[in-house]
């Protein structure tokens, strides 16, 4: 089609010049200035050539008309030679041709008026029509000019918004990637440091173990020299050498593994750095090229706009002159105006029909909004129902607190739940706000659509067929270019997602390697410790069998009543231990069930969160996709209502499941309460047992009186039995000495292993703490709504059960200690029995300590809160330490008394004449010891009462601290018992030496023995002080490290802005999905309206503000057509 305003009829075909379609560098805008064919000037040429009156002579002007401005050569002279001529030139030629035609028409009208004077009316009408067409063309030129400027500004703003969105996308993703890489690097470095520290500790422990084994080996060689031959010693040495070589090989293998891990880590770091640098350079180059192209394009657009403005000014001046001349003939145009007014009335009727349709649509939207209000009211009713259910749960919790003694715990749990309910209410309010926002958006859309309808009504008058065809053509081109841009964006996002996948795979592989190494180390350490413990247990069982044989020999001579009572006591204790083990097994089973329920709840919460996120994304997509028409927005609202209903039904089902689970937990709580009552019955049986024990003590007192009566008879029989006793005593002392030596060595080994196991458990605890911290960082994203109800109730019940068990164990330990102290008073055979009970107690303590450590580790995994010390608890701890110190002093006094007994035994051997007097002194001392033991029993009962009060009054956090204090006290007592056993072994070993050295006086022997005892006491006190100082130093170091970490965290928070944590795996997968990539809801940076992307000043500002990490994962390959195509397409 021709672009000229001149008519392209059959008489003058030269005007309709076709021009070729040329690809331009500027953006193809849908409204470049082109004169519309409002009224064709077909009548102009005919009237000029043939007048109305009749045949006239042809004028010279009319002969020149077809060869002058109407020819195709002046309109488009370049079209025959070059295809690169712009539309601007064609438009200029069309305007010039219009002006020349008007000038020629006027001259011809003047000439015809001179020649044909009797026909002025037809010429005047023709001239008026020409003037009208010219004025209409001028007005439409001005309109099209404004349209062009508006479309160009809109296009410029769209390009700027696109570029801003793309920059915001890439900058956010690149920053997140860099932060993830840095976080992974820091995690890897921290884990490498912890792994190195563990390796160093493991090597130190190995060296210490080797040194201890060497020392023990030397001791065993000294013992075995008396028993075995040289050949057996050589075989043992060879075995130890082989074991030492094996341990050294393991050490070398661990070092090689450490070096290999360091090399792999360095290689991966180098690769990541090289990739990062290459991508940075490529992104910088691309960014600079794009900036240069945009600047060039900006200059070209400015030049074109200036040229066109000048041309428009010239045209307007010429047209204004013509309009002044043609104002005289406007009166005849009123008839045309009336016709146009009729047309306007018709169009107004059409507009009224459109307004009626709009009102119908508005009524439909109001109905939909009413439906939404009804749904919200239903939601409020369901919320009230949920609140009622919460109140019922609180009542049940209060009933449980009345049944149990832990009211304060459950009240704290209920307060936490109230906080969470408030959080849930806040979430519901947030959802309601979102609904209100959606409603406001729908209203704004209706307003926008109404304004668009008004604009369309104004535009309907000026739209023509040619404009519609050009618009369709240009819109097709714009759609093609948009599709190309979307395909490019999609390709860029795919590349970015591929790189993200690679980095995540590297990170996961590193994680798995570290976790596998840690697990292997744990398994090896556990196996080694279990093997050593089993070996020690076998040796202990052998020794216990030997001791039993000796005790049977001695018990045959003594009374049988005491043995029967002790057997009953042992049976009762064994039954109690069995019941406790059964309760432990049940509790572990219930803990497993609770863990399964927690996992299920976590899965359900994750599902609900995913659904909520999907709902939110779907609503945003639907709102953005259905902005064009109002009918589509109504459909979106209906879909959203259906989705909200489905979500609400899912929440109802989830609440029903919660209520069912809560009922199950209440049934379990009832069963646990019944079991607790059974345990209370067992405790009452124990109290009955204590009453039996008091009866036994009374019987012992009566027997002591009988012993006093028998003293006289014993004095008479001492002379006869002295010879027999010396022989028996010598044999028994030898056997006891050997057994005590063996027991001391085995007890030392057990203590070393116990210390080693504690160290390993501490290391395991640190590793578990690190793993728990990482898991907590992952789990903080998910909202913990229903977990706290179930987890806190179950934890409180399990803790109550564990505390009651520990308390019963401690009561049993105190009772066994009291029985030991009672048995110490009797005879040497009773002392052997005490050794057996000590061995049994140590086994029980080892098992108890292991179970306690397991419980503590589970509690540390489940609970992340740190318990603070109260001043009242510290005061009670100080009081207990004071009581423990008093007990230590009394034990020291007992040691002195035992030393005196040994001295008296030596004096009996050396001085047979003074035995009767010494035996009387010994009986007096024994009575004094009995009185002391009774006083100690009363003190211990007082301590037990205090412990019970503490257990009943304090909370779980205080119980833990008290248990730790009691464990420390038991360890100190065990150390004192070990020292007593060492002294007994030393004294037993020193007996054969004293027999050999009978020539030395008794005074010298006594001095040597006292000096040895003093040296050992000093060594023990020094060891204690060293251990306490080391513990204090370790605690101070830990406190300093914690303070430094907290200070570093605070500094990091102050320096760095509050940014969100690294996105979870679900968010990453959602970002990679193709549906997300096509959506336009990208986070755009807020920018002022005055900012112009085409100006070089603003572009330089953006270059300065942008960080170097923004160009990390941009395209590295250049497009072949990037230099040829214009800058606005980037």
Swiss-Prot record:
**InterPro entries registered for this protein in UniProt:** FAM184A/B_N
Keywords, alphabetical: Coiled coil
Basic and acidic residues: bias regions: 983-993, 1013-1057, 1068-1081, 1116-1130
Coiled-coil residues: 121-779, 805-1061
Q: Which stretches are tagged as biased composition: Low complexity?
A: 1082-1095
Disordered: annotated segments: 1-92, 104-129, 974-1130
Which Pfam family is one of those matched by this entry? FAM184
The UniProt record lists the keyword Coiled coil:
yes
Composition-biased stretches, type Polar residues, lie in: 999-1011
Q: Identify this protein by name.
A: Putative protein tag-278
Please report the organism this UniProt entry assigns to the protein. Caenorhabditis elegans
């Amino acid at each position: 089609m021709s672009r000229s305003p001149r008519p392209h009829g059959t008489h003058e075909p030269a005007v309709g010049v076709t021009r070729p379609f040329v690809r331009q560098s500027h953006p193809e805008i849908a409204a470049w200035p082109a004169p519309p064919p409002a009224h064709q000037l077909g009548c102009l040429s005919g009237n000029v050539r043939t007048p109305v009156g009749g045949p006239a002579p042809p004028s010279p002007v009319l002969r020149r008309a077809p060869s002058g401005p109407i020819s195709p050569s002046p309109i488009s002279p370049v079209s025959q030679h070059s295809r690169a001529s712009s539309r601007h030139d064609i438009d200029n030629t069309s305007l010039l041709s219009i002006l020349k035609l008007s000038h020629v028409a006027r001259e011809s009208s003047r000439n015809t008026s001179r020649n044909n004077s009797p026909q002025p009316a037809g010429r005047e009408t023709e001239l008026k029509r020409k003037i009208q067409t010219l004025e209409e063309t001028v007005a439409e030129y001005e309109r099209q000019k404004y349209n062009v400027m508006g479309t160009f500004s809109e296009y410029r703003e769209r390009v700027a918004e696109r570029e801003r969105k793309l920059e915001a996308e890439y900058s956010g993703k690149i920053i997140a990637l860099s932060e993830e890489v840095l976080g992974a690097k820091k995690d890897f470095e921290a884990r490498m440091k912890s792994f190195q520290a563990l390796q160093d500790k493991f090597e130190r422990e190995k060296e210490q173990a080797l040194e201890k084994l060497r020392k023990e080996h030397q001791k065993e060689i000294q013992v075995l020299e008396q028993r075995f031959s040289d050949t057996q010693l050589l075989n043992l040495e060879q075995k130890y050498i082989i074991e030492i070589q094996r341990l050294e090989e393991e050490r070398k293998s661990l070092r090689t593994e450490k070096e290999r891990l360091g090399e792999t880590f360095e290689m991966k770091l180098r690769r990541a750095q090289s990739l990062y640098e290459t991508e940075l350079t490529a992104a910088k180059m691309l960014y600079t090229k794009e900036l240069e192209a945009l600047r060039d394009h900006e200059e070209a657009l400015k030049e074109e706009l200036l040229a066109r403005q000048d041309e428009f000014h010239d045209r307007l001046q010429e047209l204004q002159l013509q309009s002044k001349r043609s104002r005289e003939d406007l009166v005849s145009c009123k008839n045309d105006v009336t016709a146009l007014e009729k047309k306007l009335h018709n169009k107004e009727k059409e507009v009224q029909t459109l307004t009626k349709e709009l009102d119908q649509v508005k009524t439909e939207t109001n109905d939909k909004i009413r439906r939404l209000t009804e749904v919200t009211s239903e939601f409020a009713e369901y919320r009230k129902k949920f609140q009622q259910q919460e109140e019922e749960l609180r009542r049940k919790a209060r009933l449980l607190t009345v049944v149990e003694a832990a009211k304060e715990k459950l009240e704290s749990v209920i307060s936490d739940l109230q906080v969470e309910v408030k959080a849930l209410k806040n979430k519901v309010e947030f959802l309601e706000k979102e609904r209100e926002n959606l409603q406001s958006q729908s209203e704004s859309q209706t307003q926008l659509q109404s304004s668009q309808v008004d604009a369309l009504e104004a535009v309907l008058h000026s739209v023509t067929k040619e404009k519609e065809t050009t618009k369709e053509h240009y819109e097709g081109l714009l759609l093609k270019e948009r599709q190309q841009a979307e395909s490019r964006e999609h390709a860029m996002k795919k590349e970015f997602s591929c790189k993200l996948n690679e980095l995540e795979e590297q990170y996961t592989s590193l994680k798995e390697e570290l976790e596998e190494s840690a697990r292997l180390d744990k398994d090896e350490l556990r196996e080694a410790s279990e093997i050593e413990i089993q070996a020690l247990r076998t040796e202990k069982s052998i020794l216990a069998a030997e001791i039993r044989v000796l005790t049977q020999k001695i018990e045959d001579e003594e009374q049988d009543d005491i043995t029967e009572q002790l057997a009953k006591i042992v049976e009762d204790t064994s039954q109690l231990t069995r019941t406790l083990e059964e309760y432990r097994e049940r509790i572990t089973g219930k803990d497993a069930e609770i863990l399964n329920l927690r996992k299920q709840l976590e899965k359900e919460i994750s599902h609900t969160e995913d659904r909520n996120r999907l709902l939110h994304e779907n609503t945003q997509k639907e709102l953005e996709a259905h902005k064009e028409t109002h009918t589509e927005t109504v459909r979106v609202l209906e879909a959203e209502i259906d989705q909200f209903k489905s979500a609400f039904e899912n929440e109802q089902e989830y609440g029903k499941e919660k209520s069912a689970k809560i009922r199950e937990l209440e049934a379990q709580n009832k069963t646990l309460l019944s079991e607790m009552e059974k345990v209370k019955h067992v405790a009452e049986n124990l109290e009955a047992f204590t009453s039996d024990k008091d009866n036994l003590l009374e019987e012992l007192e009566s027997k002591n009186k009988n012993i006093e009566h028998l003293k006289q008879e014993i004095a008479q029989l001492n002379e006869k039995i002295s010879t027999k006793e010396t022989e028996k005593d010598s044999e028994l002392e030898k056997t006891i000495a050997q057994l005590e030596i063996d027991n001391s060595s085995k007890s030392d080994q057990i203590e070393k292993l116990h210390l080693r196991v504690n160290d390993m458990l501490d290391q395991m605890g640190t590793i578990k703490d690190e793993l728990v911290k990482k898991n907590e960082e992952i789990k903080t994203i998910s909202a913990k709504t229903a977990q706290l109800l179930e987890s806190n109730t179950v934890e409180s019940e399990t803790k109550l059960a564990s505390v009651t068990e520990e308390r019963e164990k401690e009561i049993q330990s105190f009772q066994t200690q009291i029985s030991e102290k009672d048995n110490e008073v009797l005879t040497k055979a009773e002392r052997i029995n005490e050794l057996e009970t000590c061995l049994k107690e140590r086994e029980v303590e080892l098992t108890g300590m292991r179970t306690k450590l397991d419980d503590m580790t589970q509690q540390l995994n489940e609970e992340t809160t740190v318990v603070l010390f109260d001043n009242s608890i510290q005061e009670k701890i100080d009081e207990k330490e004071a009581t423990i110190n008093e007990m230590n002093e009394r034990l020291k006094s007992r040691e002195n008394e035992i030393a005196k007994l040994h001295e008296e035994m030596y004096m009996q051997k050396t001085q047979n004449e003074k035995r009767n007097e010494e035996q009387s002194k010994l009986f007096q001392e024994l009575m004094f010891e009995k009185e002391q033991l009774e006083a100690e029993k009363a003190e211990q009962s007082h301590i037990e009462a205090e412990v019970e009060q503490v257990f009943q009054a304090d909370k779980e956090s205080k119980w833990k601290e008290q248990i730790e204090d009691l464990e420390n006290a038991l360890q100190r007592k065990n150390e004192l018992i070990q020292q007593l056993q060492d002294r007994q072994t030393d004294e037993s070993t020193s007996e054969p030496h004293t027999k050999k050295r009978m020539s030395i006086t008794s005074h010298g022997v006594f001095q040597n023995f006292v000096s040895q005892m003093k040296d050992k006491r000093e060594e023990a006190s020094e060891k204690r002080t060293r251990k306490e100082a080391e513990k204090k130093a370790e605690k101070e170091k830990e406190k300093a490290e914690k303070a430094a970490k907290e200070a570093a965290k605070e500094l990091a928070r102050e320096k760095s802005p509050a940014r969100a944590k690294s996105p979870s795996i679900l968010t990453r997968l959602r970002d990679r999905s193709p549906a997300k990539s096509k959506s336009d809801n990208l986070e755009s940076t807020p920018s002022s309206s005055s900012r112009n992307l085409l100006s070089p000043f603003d572009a330089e500002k953006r270059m300065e503000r942008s960080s170097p990490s923004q160009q990390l994962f941009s395209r590295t390959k250049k497009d072949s057509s990037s230099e040829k195509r214009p800058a606005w397409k980037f």
